UniProtKB/Swiss-Prot annotation:
GO molecular function, one term: phospho-N-acetylmuramoyl-pentapeptide-transferase activity
Family: Belongs to the glycosyltransferase 4 family. MraY subfamily.
InterPro entries assigned to the protein according to its UniProt record, in alphabetical order: Glycosyl_transferase_4, PNAcMuramoyl-5peptid_Trfase, PNAcMuramoyl-5peptid_Trfase_CS
Localization terms from the record: Cell inner membrane
Transmembrane segments: 23-43, 73-93, 95-115, 132-152, 211-231, 248-268, 285-305, 307-327, 332-352, 387-407
Catalyzed chemical reaction(s): UDP-N-acetyl-alpha-D-muramoyl-L-alanyl-gamma-D-glutamyl-meso-2,6-diaminopimeloyl-D-alanyl-D-alanine + di-trans,octa-cis-undecaprenyl phosphate = di-trans,octa-cis-undecaprenyl diphospho-N-acetyl-alpha-D-muramoyl-L-alanyl-D-glutamyl-meso-2,6-diaminopimeloyl-D-alanyl-D-alanine + UMP
Classification via PROSITE patterns: MRAY_1, MRAY_2
Protein name: Phospho-N-acetylmuramoyl-pentapeptide-transferase
Annotated source species: Christiangramia forsetii (strain DSM 17595 / CGMCC 1.15422 / KT0803) (Gramella forsetii)
Length: 410
């Protein structure tokens, strides 16, 4: 909203300094500063409110050291992340941008599902929370919205061959590129570490009959649904010990922010020989606000946690990361960039699958890990949770660097 206000003041009254709001870098900086302020300053007030209303975590005894001490810790802290993200976005982003709209919808959609789950657990005293089938339906619903928007919306395009305009203006991330050239409506994505790294989803169906290329949405939309569901569940499983989900997600989000910025900049996309995605640079405002909210939330969520994000936060985080990866055409990089989420997910799948298999074969269930998800396995081995979290963050940073390298190494 401030963007439109200062744009008006610049055009009508030539207000000194109003032109700053034309620059993506300035608005991104303001977004992260404001989100950090909201999440740290007002986050404390929200935590006190949650504590006063006795909205606390009910902890099941899983035999983990220090677990029972966490009983009663305020939960639903994901609302801090959501509020600290949306306020800067509404103030500094271009609200007509389709990518910004999609991310706002994702935040509210997944936040509502997570909030309902936490509400049932906390107020209805049902430890299972929202039934799993309803969570999955909600995730599928979001995936359907994202998939249809990405495929059918006319403003979501790519451009492989760029035409250089004003190098100085673009390098400093001026808000808009004047001459973008022809835009292409397609379902192209990028394959990491491959020289000719562009992949068209329509090729999965067009080989049967070239005329089927118009039905590529039959392939593309289900893939988007799968990605949204998988990543949101991965983030949800990762939120098991203090600071793990928020810290790991901040690393992932900042990396995706870099991808969004270079993909939305005509000069850098040309220099790096990557796909230019018109209008995607505006996502940087959302990403910086979201990253600031996560870091601010960590102020209270690191060991010993003063608040838990609950499903309100974890499902929202996973949904946003999935949509960011899809929007920047980096969804095939998710197994690398979101490697922490992946191993947490796989540890649960392997544990459950092996237990069921051995029970059928030997009459008793056997386990691969002492406990799943993987972070609980290390807790069972006697590792302190703060050490586990920091080591997972280090792995996350390594995976983020590896992901960034794909911009140039093919």
């Amino acid at each position: 909203m401030l963007y439109y206000l200062f744009k008006f003041l610049e055009e009508q009254y030539q207000l000194p300094g109003a032109q700053l709001f034309d620059f993506l870098s300035f608005r991104s900086a303001m977004a992260i500063i404001l989100s950090l302020g909201i999440s740290t300053i007002y986050g404390k007030r929200i935590i006190n409110y949650l504590r006063a209303k006795q909205i606390g975590e009910s902890v099941r005894d899983l035999g983990l050291k220090g677990q029972t001490e966490k009983a009663g810790t305020p939960t639903m802290g994901g609302v801090i992340i959501i509020i600290a993200t949306l306020i800067p976005v509404l103030l500094f982003a271009k609200l007509e941008n389709i990518y910004v709209i999609l991310l706002i919808v994702t935040t509210l959609w997944m936040g509502a599902i997570g909030f309902l789950d936490d509400y049932i657990k906390t107020f209805k005293k049902d430890k299972e929370g929202l039934k799993g089938i309803f969570k999955v339906i909600g995730q599928i619903g979001l995936g359907l919205i994202v998939g249809c928007t990405m495929y059918f919306h006319p403003q979501i395009t790519t451009k492989e061959v760029v035409t250089e305009t004003n190098p100085t203006e673009n390098v400093i991330a001026r808000a808009e590129v004047v001459d973008m050239g022809p835009e292409v409506k397609d379902t192209t994505t990028t394959i990491p570490f491959v020289k000719n790294n562009e992949f068209e989803y329509s090729s999965l169906i067009s080989w049967i009959n070239p005329s089927l290329v118009n039905y590529a949405w039959l392939i593309f939309i289900p893939i988007v649904i799968f990605i949204v569901t998988a990543v949101s569940n991965g983030a949800n499983l990762t939120d098991g010990i203090d600071g793990l989900a928020a810290g790991s997600s901040a690393i992932i989000v900042l990396t995706l922010g870099l991808f969004a910025w270079v993909s939305g900049n005509i000069i850098f996309s040309d220099y790096l020989n990557i796909m230019y995605i018109p209008r995607s640079g505006e996502m940087t405002i959302f990403i910086t606000a979201f990253a600031g909210a996560l870091v601010g939330f960590l102020w209270y969520n690191t060991y010993p946690a003063q608040v838990f994000m609950g499903d309100t936060g974890s499902l929202t985080i996973g949904g946003i990361i999935a949509v960011l990866a899809i929007a920047t055409r980096k969804e095939l990089l998710i197994p690398v960039l979101c490697g922490i989420f992946l191993i947490e997910n796989l540890s649960v799948v392997m544990q459950v699958g092996w237990f069921k298999f051995t029970r059928m074969k030997y009459g008793e269930g056997r386990r691969i890990f002492l406990m799943s998800p993987l972070h609980h396995h290390y807790q069972k081995k006697g590792k302190h949770e703060s050490k586990i979290v920091v080591r997972f963050w280090i792995i996350g940073i390594f995976l983020a660097i590896l992901s960034i390298i794909t911009l140039k190494v093919r």
